[in-house]
Amino acid sequence: MRLENKIALITGGASGLGLATTERFVTEGCRVLVTDIQAEQGEELSARFGNDVLFRRCDVTREDEVEAAFEFAEQELGPIDAVFHSAGIIGAVGPITTTPGDEWRFSIDILLNGTFYAVKHAARVMVPRKKGSIISMASTAGLMGGLGPHAYAAAKHAVVGLTKNVAAELAGEGVRINAVAATGMATPMVAVSLTGDPSKIEEAKETLAETSPLKGRAGLAEDVANAVLWLASDESGYTTGHTLTTDAGLTVGATPEGPAFSEYQPLFREGGKRGLESS
């Protein structure tokens, strides 16, 4: 098993990407502390897995609660080997001219400040032991423009930058930090955006499959879980400061119709011929 006898802390682990990752980690021999604000779902998850999964309610915008969660995990489970910070929201959607300041601040608080708190306290417990893997949830919206609400995109760009900066700092301490950048995946959060109902994951999956660069293949929570598993395991032991994309090629220009700007290919070909003829 790839995480046998390992201990992990997963924020936002009661649903979506965090839940899929929790389930994947447990099958690989890991014991997990799940934190979330969804207490009922978290308690149900803990009951399902017994001693392999503990739950603690935690609001990631509260640094004191994040710090307490790390202390609880170390006390109840033992030294933390891996942290996956997946807690997040999509946030306010709309043009920049009408984006309310309070909604902007709320999104930044969860998506960026929450990441900072998780990374900070993960480093605090890992640096003295000179080992550990931290994984943050970024997004394709953090790698390119035109995707997602403005606050979400800004925060995810910042998460990518934070990952690089902290990796440079902690490499000498033996601690690794990476991020996973996903596109829209079939999760309750994305289902809300596409259908207005978090339970309509199958309907969201159909829409995602139709628009995916990998024609007919929707992105699944399990795809992200597998990426996080690799980054948490010793298999990625020489990888730090990296943002791993699970996006069906979106950020390299793949589209359902073929490569981005493929409509210009005939012009490029003709231009190339003219260039050869005139050379």
Where are these regions (language model features)?
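C-terminal helical subdomain
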Residues: 179, 187, 201-235, 239, ...
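Active-site helix of classical SDR
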Residues: 119, 155, 163
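Conserved mid-core segment of classical short-chain dehydrogenase/reductases
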Residues: 67, 90-105, 128, 148-151, ...
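Alpha-helical segment proximal to the catalytic Tyr-Lys
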Residues: 124, 168-172, 237
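Residue(s) in the substrate-gating loop at a strand-loop-helix junction
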Residues: 139
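Canonical Rossmann dinucleotide-binding motif of NAD(H)/NADP(H)-dependent dehydrogenases/reductases
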Residues: 3-33
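Catalytic Tyr-X3-Lys loop
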Residues: 97-116, 131, 135, 159
